[in-house]
Amino acid sequence: MPPLSRLKGKSFSWIINKVISIIVENIKIFYFRWRRVIHEKNIYRCRDEYHFDRSSLTKVRGAGISGIMRLYNEERYLESSIESYIEQLDELIIVHNRCTDSTPEICEKMRLKYPHKIKVFHYIPSVAPPGSLAHVALDPRDERSLVNYYNFALSKTTKEYVMKVDGDCILIADAFLKIREYILSKKPSDEYNYFFGINLKYNDMGELALRKSAPLTAGYDHGIFKVSKNTFFKHAYNYEVFSHKLKEKNNGIVFFHLKSLKEDLAVDSHGLDTEFYRGYFNDRLSQDVIEWDDFPQIRGIHRPDHIKSL
């Protein structure tokens, strides 16, 4: 269930439907997990090198902000994404999983360019993709679980504060700098400083616009938090979610999200044909857009036409 603060403004019927959907999803999780345990004859499997222990998050940490980047076939915009973030981060932890494109080579290139900031790890177990039945059925402690994969990346960070970074996002440096300065000067320990990205899409004229169905990213998906044993990732029906007990603070728009600009949308489906991915791609393939000047929330943000040349 979402934190109570997120229910503000929601109708009673929306809350009831949300509760029912969560109950149904949890019944399905229990059923498919039970079937897998019967078949595999274990609750979960995880080799020591991939085991996540929440107590590891309480280690002494240095001042600054760590970024965690988890990657699968992100070659298209990866180098540009790293370049846009690296000056604003004190550390970037990159973990890639069984990529079939040039993602690992790009990671190594960037590590050599920024050896004082970038650490790269190859997570070898085959991670169940979000939206897959395998993801639903796996215990979050299993080395094949998307949840364990995220927590593994989190455990490799060494700075006080952590934020998620995606391989298809370009940071708006001026906007983020204000957040960075606030974090490092005020050192908030009880806040999740979340922010949004603009979901870019091409219009019929080949100009940058916004996805009509979702002009902005999910706000709670990206943000900065102080690491503790109570900040980690947990299992949800289709994907992982960030678990915390922090006050949530909105910091506005700070990045551009380029996923819908990719030529090969099938890469993100991991070859799966499920209801989750069919809905996902039908939405992204839709030609419906909001023109740049028609979306009030981005007034003052210049259209990033330089992205077209990346």
Task: Walk through the language-model features, giving the residues of each.
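Short beta-strand-to-loop acidic/aromatic patch adjacent to the donor-nucleotide binding site
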Residues: 159-170
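A short acidic, amphipathic alpha-helical/loop segment
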Residues: 80-84, 106, 178-182
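Active-site-proximal specificity loops/subdomain of glycosyltransferases
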Residues: 51-62, 105-161
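Catalytic-site signature of metal-activated, phosphate-bearing donor transferases
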Residues: 9-58, 136-154, 169-310
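Short beta-strand/loop segment that forms part of the nucleotide-sugar
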Residues: 90-101, 119-125
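Ser/Thr-glycine-rich phosphate-binding loops at phosphate-binding pockets of nucleotides
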Residues: 71, 84, 88, 97-112
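Active-site beta-to-alpha loop of glycosyltransferases that engages the nucleotide-sugar donor
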Residues: 61-83, 98
